[in-house]
Design a protein with these regions (language model features):
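Extended beta-strand/beta-hairpin segments
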Residues: 1-45, 53-136
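Alpha-helical metal-binding/catalytic segments enriched in His/Glu/Asp
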Residues: 50
Length: 136
């Protein structure tokens, strides 16, 4: 999996992969134009949409109703180091029988983004400047 992020002016960036584009910006208070979500909002969006996809897959596989399926993700900002903490995924499936609740939760906890966040990935940062930094 690979994507490219390019600075497009101000504090705005554009991520591109597989022909798709996504704008990331900051609110005016942080010097941006508020043309897109912030990086933390995008992270929570990835988690929420992944959780929603896994919940939907579970419901569809069992011919359970998915009407009104919604996912709300909240988080608190923490410091030292700066990060998001206490992330809560709230899934609502109004037409689904209550006895499916724990099974839906298990399916959500199997999602790729959930697993990535709960099992710390190895992250390597490589910086290239000058001659080595020519953008292709």
């Amino acid at each position: 999996m690979e994507l490219t992020v390019r600075h497009t002016g101000g504090v705005r960036f554009e991520a591109q992969t597989r022909g798709h584009r996504l704008i990331c910006d900051q609110p005016a208070v942080n010097g941006g134009e508020d043309l897109g979500m912030t990086p933390p909002e995008l992270l929570l969006s990835s988690l929420g949409t992944c959780a929603g996809f896994y919940a939907l897959a579970y419901l569809k596989a069992r011919s359970l109703p998915s009407d009104g399926l919604t996912v709300k993700v909240t988080a608190e900002k923490a410091t030292k180091p700066a990060r998001l903490d206490h992330i809560v995924i709230e899934v609502k499936a109004p037409g689904c029988p209550p006895e499916q609740e724990s099974w839906i939760q298990r399916s959500i906890e199997a999602c790729l983004i959930h697993n990535t966040l709960t099992h710390s990935p190895h992250i390597e940062t490589v910086v290239r400047v000058g001659e080595l930094a020519h953008v292709s």
